[in-house]
Regions:
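Conserved ABC ATPase signature
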Residues: 137-141, 145
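Catalytic Walker B motif of ABC-type/P-loop ATPase nucleotide-binding domains
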Residues: 162-165
Length: 255
């Protein structure tokens, strides 16, 4: 049984059909990366799994249990199993670094502040940040350090499933490589299932076990990361090599 099973996922906004029947599985302990250009439905797919958006049709099962339509305490219990690294880090500038890391523990799980701080320091250490940054405000940190803090927050409650939204956006190549290494380290160390969305092929190659390509609201290819450069799929070939000419370009021009 897959950890995550998505079938026939559809979502439209007014006349704009974003998801047109998305299907994929993610095995337990696997790192799936969903690639695709801007506006192809990557973020909408993640938001549907998280319950931030309600799909118009389709099924999303976690460990064989349907999650579409969950609300109240049932939704809250499901969310406790998730961790999320947002594209812009999404840290609270009014809180100290350790309070950002511990926010979900204190507010969502009722963990006492002293214990939550200990956990926060432990998770900061796991992403290469020392105790000296704990009392600082996020604005006092570099973009790369903020991303590390956000990763520490994502793993603070030791979730079963981690979601990464464009984890290396805005980072220089060296810091992006650091974040990619930390993602792999955290995913493997915790034994969690991971779903990432990105258009960064360097990041994809480093963190993915399997890759799915989303185009015009459908998965057009799904396979092992090792096969990405010889997929035999014209959409994938054009995207990963950054070629202007190809089926993606032709369909955009015809739209």
């Amino acid at each position: 049984m897959p950890k995550i099973a998505v079938r026939g996922l559809q979502k439209s906004f007014a006349v704009n059909r974003v998801l047109a029947g998305v299907d994929f599985d993610v095995a337990a302990g696997e790192s799936l990366v969903i690639i695709g250009g801007s506006g192809t439905g990557k973020s909408v797919t993640i938001k549907c799994i998280l319950g931030l958006l309600v799909p118009d049709a389709g099924s999303i099962e976690i460990d064989g249990v349907e999650t579409v339509g969950l609300a109240g305490r049932a939704r809250a219990r499901l969310m406790h199993r998730f961790g999320m690294l947002f594209q812009g880090s999404a840290l609270f500038d009014s809180l100290a670094v350790w309070e950002n890391v511990a926010f979900g523990l204190i507010q969502g799980r009722g963990v006492p502040r002293r214990r939550a701080r200990d956990i926060a320091l432990e998770k900061l250490a796991a992403v290469g940040l020392g105790a000296e940054v704990a009392a600082l405000r996020p604005a006092q940190l570099s973009g790369g350090m903020q991303k590390r803090v956000a990763l520490a927050r994502a793993i603070a409650a030791e979730p079963e499933i981690l979601f990464f939204d464009e984890p290396t956006t805005g980072l220089d190549p060296i810091m992006a490589d650091v974040i990619n290494r930390l993602i792999v380290q955290c995913v493997r160390g915790l034994g969690v299932t991971a779903v990432s969305i990105t258009h960064d092929m360097v990041s994809t190659r480093k963190i993915a076990d399997r890759v799915a390509m989303l185009h015009r609201g459908r998965i057009v290819w799904h396979g092992p990361a090792a096969d990405i450069d010889h997929s035999g799929n014209p959409f994938v070939d054009q995207f990963v090599n950054g070629r202007e000419a190809g089926p993606i370009h032709m369909q955009i021009r015809a739209a």
